[in-house]
């Protein structure tokens, strides 16, 4: 529950900081971009909920099968994220103009950057079955807190310089740190880092 609340709060940090530091207009433009990129965030939860039982069952059958199924999940999730992020990057301007109009054209470069948070958000959600099976649900909260801390610090630096684009860079970087790089720090989750890396590269 606490982790869920932390995620909900974190996803609003950018808009709050933009509004306070730059103004409501910048926050509104940023919001238009994030509404497009975040509309996809339900996908990994649906997939993970459907495959979790088979992954948890594989743990009892052997480590090889267990990690093989986890790798397949990461590969699927990363593939879907790339399939969303790449077209959105190149079509960001027509998407913004179609959905919000010319007055929101400045949201286009923000969307082209922010959409890449999708990849690491997806990978973070895909780690869920492993957290449950290994009895390490506390890692989820820790990773969320790392993500939020990095995001706030970078926002303080980048928003005054680049407004919404700075906030988008902060968001993507914070997800990279919290959902991906943080796994290499912990001995228990280091193997997950390498599974995620293989799915990306």
Regions found by a protein language model. Give the residues of each.
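Transmembrane helical elements of multi-pass membrane transporters/channels
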Residues: 1-53, 117, 121-125
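Interfacial segments at transmembrane-helix termini and the short loops linking adjacent helices
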Residues: 24-25, 64, 89-119
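Residue-level recognition of pore/gate-forming positions within transmembrane alpha-helices
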Residues: 8, 35-38, 85, 118, ...
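Membrane-interface junctions at transmembrane-helix termini in multi-pass inner-membrane proteins
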Residues: 115-145, 186
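Membrane-interface helix-loop junctions in multi-pass transport and translocation proteins
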Residues: 135-138, 145-180, 187-188, 192
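Helix-loop interface residues and adjacent transmembrane-helix termini in multi-pass membrane transporters
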Residues: 21-24, 133-134, 161
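Helix-loop junctions and terminal segments of transmembrane helices
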Residues: 37-63, 67, 130-133
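Interfacial transmembrane-helix starts/ends
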Residues: 63-79, 83-91, 108-111
């Amino acid at each position: 529950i606490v982790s869920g609340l932390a995620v909900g709060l974190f996803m609003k940090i950018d808009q709050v900081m933009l509004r306070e530091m730059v103004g409501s207009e910048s926050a509104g433009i940023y919001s238009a971009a994030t509404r497009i990129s975040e509309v996809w965030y339900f996908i990994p939860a649906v997939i993970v909920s459907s495959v979790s039982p088979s992954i948890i069952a594989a743990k009892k059958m052997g480590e090889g099968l267990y990690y093989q199924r986890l790798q397949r999940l990461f590969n699927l999730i990363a593939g879907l994220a790339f399939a969303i992020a790449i077209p959105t990057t190149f079509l960001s301007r027509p998407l913004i103009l179609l959905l919000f109009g010319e007055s929101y054209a400045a949201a286009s470069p923000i969307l082209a950057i922010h959409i890449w948070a999708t990849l690491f958000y997806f990978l973070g959600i895909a780690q869920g079955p492993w957290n449950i099976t290994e009895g390490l649900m506390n890692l989820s909260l820790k990773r969320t807190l790392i993500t939020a801390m990095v995001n706030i610090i970078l926002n303080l630096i980048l928003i005054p310089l680049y407004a919404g684009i700075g906030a988008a860079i902060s968001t993507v970087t914070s997800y990279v740190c919290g959902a991906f790089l943080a796994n290499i720090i912990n001995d228990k989750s280091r193997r997950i880092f390498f599974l995620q890396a293989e799915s990306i590269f």
